[in-house]
Amino acid sequence: MERYYLAIDIGASSGRHILGHMEDGKMVLEEIYRFPNGMQKRDGEKVWDIEALFEAVLAGMKKCRELGKIPVSVGIDTWAVDFVLLDKDDQRIGNAVAYRDDRTKGMDEDCLLYTSDAADDLTRV
């Protein structure tokens, strides 16, 4: 029985599910599902539609099931510069604000104000 591995790549304009397995000592990759993505304006902020992304991730996994190719593991890669704040019950607080939102202007310069020593002092447990 084949062992399948699912990689989900979520980019700024689209996402895709790539299913891989080994065949005759070589890795075989197959695109299973593709979906659109993009920032939206919501409450005056540029945000990601987290609900739509979650549904797209599930839809691609369901496609694997339809094909009878159930992955033994799943990895998800994103642009990795955005965040969502959670409350004490792990519920979202507000929108998933995108890195291109106006609130991030000048942040790279602000980050340079902290030397590695100062950052260590701030983050040390």
Language-model features: locations:
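Single conserved hydrophobic/aromatic residue that forms the stacking wall/gate
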Residues: 114-125
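Residues that scaffold the ATP/ADP-binding catalytic core of kinase and kinase-like folds
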Residues: 95, 107, 125
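Active-site core segments that coordinate phosphate-bearing ligands/cofactors
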Residues: 2, 6-7, 19, 105, ...
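N-terminal glycine/serine-rich phosphate-binding loop of ATP-dependent small-molecule kinases
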Residues: 1-95
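Carbohydrate-associated surface elements
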Residues: 101
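Short, glycine/acidic-enriched loop or turn micro-motifs at the edges of active sites
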Residues: 12, 104, 120
